[in-house]
Amino acid sequence: SPRDMLSRLETMVLMAGVDLPVRAIREQIASAADLIIHQSRLKDGTRKIVSITEVQGLEGDVIVLQDIFTFVQTGVDQNGRVQGYFKSSGVLPRFMDRFEAYGIKLPLTIFNPDYSEEVKNDTSNPSTGKLSRRFFDGVLRL
């Protein structure tokens, strides 16, 4: 999970012998990362993006995370492959102004909480799902 990734990153810094307080490590992590893209191996053996989470900063001693999109599994097809869709949390990410500054225009409707986009199993294209292609094309340009 994105939260687990942050804990592991913090642990790696501590194991490296760097003499920094935990708060300083968290401040560095929170200021360095804007998004966490969580990819997971599913029960069918495929890997899929299962969440896109924004790092919103530090609140007290806690790195604040906000899911933007999550993958919702709806079942499996006749071949045993996981089926599902991306669901928006309804939160407009704070980095949208940076996207616009780089000329990346995403339709705001994809951030509507009622918006979801089915993920098609297309073995010829590892980046399945229209949302993932559209969104990640923008993310990768940053």
Residue ranges with predicted function:
Residues S1-G60:
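Conserved P-loop NTPase nucleotide-binding/switch module
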